């Protein structure tokens, strides 16, 4: 029964996890979404209104429109050999803020702090990220003689 073409073949992705069934927590509705926010799309099976198509499940996009109950998201979708920026409307139950932007925001705050300190001390600071450099060379000293390692001969 592999590669079935049934109507419910992809419906498992919208099912909720164990102990997460039932009513939706209030913080889902109290989360603020603004234009330009990066969000992850994850379809919630307990809400069928304005649910994203299963193609967009697990995708990340940017918000371009905010309404009372839903948001408009720009998502990249691959169609044959090209990638198209699709605009979809999704209710807020099916999205959450993406964690991919957290490291960037932390870096921005850290750079602002460094820039402020440098301005106070009147020095120039480089805020560009540097790739990891090769390790510095060092000598390995050992008082013991090197040990010769040989395979044990096979005996039948």
Curated annotation (Swiss-Prot):
The UniProt annotation puts the region (Disordered) at: 127-156
Q: Name one GO cellular component term.
A: ribosome
Q: Which InterPro entries match?
A: Ribosomal_eL21, Ribosomal_eL21_CS, Ribosomal_eL21_sf, Translation_prot_SH3-like_sf
The record's annotation in Pfam families points to: Ribosomal_L21e
- What does UniProt give as the signal peptide span? none
Gene Ontology BP annotations:
translation
Q: Which keywords has UniProt assigned to this entry?
A: Ribonucleoprotein, Ribosomal protein
One GO term in the molecular function aspect is: structural constituent of ribosome
What family is this?
Answer: Belongs to the eukaryotic ribosomal protein eL21 family.
This chain belongs to the protein called Large ribosomal subunit protein eL21
Species of origin reads Pyura stolonifera
- Identify the gene encoding this protein: RPL21
């Amino acid at each position: 029964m592999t590669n079935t073409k049934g109507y419910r073949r992809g419906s498992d992705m919208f099912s909720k996890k164990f102990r997460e069934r039932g009513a939706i927590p209030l913080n889902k509705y109290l989360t603020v979404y603004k234009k330009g926010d990066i969000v992850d799309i994850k379809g919630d099976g307990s809400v069928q209104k304005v649910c994203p198509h299963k193609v967009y499940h697990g995708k990340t996009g940017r918000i371009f429109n905010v309404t009372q109950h839903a948001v408009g998201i720009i998502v990249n979708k691959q169609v044959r050999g090209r990638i198209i920026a699709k605009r979809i409307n999704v209710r807020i139950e099916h999205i959450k803020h993406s964690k991919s932007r957290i490291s960037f925001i932390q870096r921005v705050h850290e750079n602002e702090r460094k820039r402020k300190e440098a301005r106070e001390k009147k020095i120039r600071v480089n805020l560009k990220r540097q790739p990891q450099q090769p390790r510095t060379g060092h000598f390995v000293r050992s008082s013991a003689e090197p040990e010769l390692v040989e395979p044990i001969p096979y005996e039948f």
